[in-house]
Amino acid sequence: MSAKSNQRGAKAPLLGSKIKLNIEKLAIGGAGVARHEGMVVFVPQAAPNEEILAEITLVKKNFMEARVVEILTASPHRREPPCPVAHTCGGCNWQHITEEEQRRQKHTLVLETIKKFNRDLEFNYLPIQPSPRVLRYRNRIQPKFKNGRFGFFARNSHQIVETMDCLITEETLTDKFAEVKAWAEKKNAKDLQRLEMYIAEEGDVRYGLITDEDDGIGFSQVNRFQNEDLLRTALDWAGDGPYKKVYDLYAGAGNFTFPLAAKYAGSEIIGVELNPKLVERARSKITDKRMTYFMSDVETYMRRASIGKDDLVVLDPPRAGASEYTMQTLAAAQPRKIIYISCHPVSLARDLNWFFAQTQKLGIKYKLDRVQTFEMFPQTDHVETIAELRVDS
């Protein structure tokens, strides 16, 4: 592959060439960030504040990717991963970094991302909420089975890293790995890559295949220990009310819906969720006539919703975030308060930008009151964030 030029006109290194890099920080996606002759270089499995010898693996117009060949000066935040397969398994990309530094990097990443989309946005940015567990916290996983091999996909590959344990998974699940492997072998299939294991609400372990017709249990919080703290914060930030209606958008099986119904006894509670199995599960638990669950994608629902100024809106979208239409419609509806829970900093920052662009256009005064990150996924770059938006009176 021929060398390409970067924006400053200097030639980028050839593919496969080796260069020295100083890792400045970590990026969304988990890679270390360095600069070489004005060009950004992303290096997986690097750690902040270390010097490495790296091999260029990808050259693009505005950035490069590289792999660590040798650590010349180790980061003070680098450690030996607690998991023996962490260097090859694709499940955890930050096990080589201390937990304290993981939290610091996530906290910084969210702030930088929000400011990148809207540098004028002012808000109270609270310290990150650590997870009660940094290991053994996942209650839902998707192990892989292929040609007698049981484990997880290797990083950036469909090759299976064999393991009969996973240090970020609750032992209630990992204790069943041998049973699940034996079950997979009995199915006499060469390739069972769409397995799912989870701890049910009743406390028992369930497992099976995910099919095109059945996409598993759908979205649910995988860290029940941290989810309790997130719920408490969301309910606290929502305030005392009273609200005429309380909307839970992207409601899942009711993680927020039912606690909201318990807190706001005089409000009409509306959940909106697209996944039919999650809607069915939520509806089966409803005993209060004030509660209604709609099976719909949120944007379609917003086209007929009657959200008012005396209402509370809670939304917890997937990684892709909400749509521009949804955020603009929310802004125009002017609910008294909005609690936004996000699992991806970029979609959060983009959605906030859409929202405040619309309020400015309509002459509506809203305030981003406070933002806090939650360490929902230790040992990975993923982070949960909660934001409170309210009418600025």
UniProtKB/Swiss-Prot annotation:
<dbReference type="InterPro" id="IPR029063">
    <property type="entry name" value="SAM-dependent_MTases_sf"/>
</dbReference>
<dbReference type="InterPro" id="IPR030390">
    <property type="entry name" value="MeTrfase_TrmA_AS"/>
</dbReference>
<protein>
    <recommendedName>
        <fullName>Uncharacterized RNA methyltransferase Bd3828</fullName>
        <ecNumber>2.1.1.-</ecNumber>
    </recommendedName>
</protein>
<dbReference type="GO" id="GO:0046872">
    <property type="term" value="F:metal ion binding"/>
</dbReference>
<dbReference type="Pfam" id="PF05958">
    <property type="entry name" value="tRNA_U5-meth_tr"/>
</dbReference>
<dbReference type="GO" id="GO:0070475">
    <property type="term" value="P:rRNA base methylation"/>
</dbReference>
<dbReference type="Pfam" id="PF01938">
    <property type="entry name" value="TRAM"/>
</dbReference>
<feature type="binding site">
    <location>
        <position position="89"/>
    </location>
    <ligand>
        <name>[4Fe-4S] cluster</name>
    </ligand>
</feature>
<feature type="binding site">
    <location>
        <position position="166"/>
    </location>
    <ligand>
        <name>[4Fe-4S] cluster</name>
    </ligand>
</feature>
<keyword id="KW-0479">Metal-binding</keyword>
<keyword id="KW-0004">4Fe-4S</keyword>
<comment type="similarity">
    <text>Belongs to the class I-like SAM-binding methyltransferase superfamily. RNA M5U methyltransferase family.</text>
</comment>
<feature type="binding site">
    <location>
        <position position="221"/>
    </location>
    <ligand>
        <name>S-adenosyl-L-methionine</name>
    </ligand>
</feature>
<keyword id="KW-0408">Iron</keyword>
<keyword id="KW-0411">Iron-sulfur</keyword>
<dbReference type="GO" id="GO:0070041">
    <property type="term" value="F:rRNA (uridine-C5-)-methyltransferase activity"/>
</dbReference>
<dbReference type="GO" id="GO:0051539">
    <property type="term" value="F:4 iron, 4 sulfur cluster binding"/>
</dbReference>
<dbReference type="InterPro" id="IPR012340">
    <property type="entry name" value="NA-bd_OB-fold"/>
</dbReference>
<dbReference type="InterPro" id="IPR010280">
    <property type="entry name" value="U5_MeTrfase_fam"/>
</dbReference>
<keyword id="KW-0489">Methyltransferase</keyword>
<feature type="binding site">
    <location>
        <position position="92"/>
    </location>
    <ligand>
        <name>[4Fe-4S] cluster</name>
    </ligand>
</feature>
<dbReference type="InterPro" id="IPR002792">
    <property type="entry name" value="TRAM_dom"/>
</dbReference>
<keyword id="KW-0949">S-adenosyl-L-methionine</keyword>
<feature type="binding site">
    <location>
        <position position="316"/>
    </location>
    <ligand>
        <name>S-adenosyl-L-methionine</name>
    </ligand>
</feature>
<feature type="active site" description="Nucleophile">
    <location>
        <position position="343"/>
    </location>
</feature>
<feature type="binding site">
    <location>
        <position position="83"/>
    </location>
    <ligand>
        <name>[4Fe-4S] cluster</name>
    </ligand>
</feature>
<feature type="binding site">
    <location>
        <position position="250"/>
    </location>
    <ligand>
        <name>S-adenosyl-L-methionine</name>
    </ligand>
</feature>
<feature type="binding site">
    <location>
        <position position="273"/>
    </location>
    <ligand>
        <name>S-adenosyl-L-methionine</name>
    </ligand>
</feature>
<keyword id="KW-0808">Transferase</keyword>
<feature type="domain" description="TRAM">
    <location>
        <begin position="12"/>
        <end position="70"/>
    </location>
</feature>
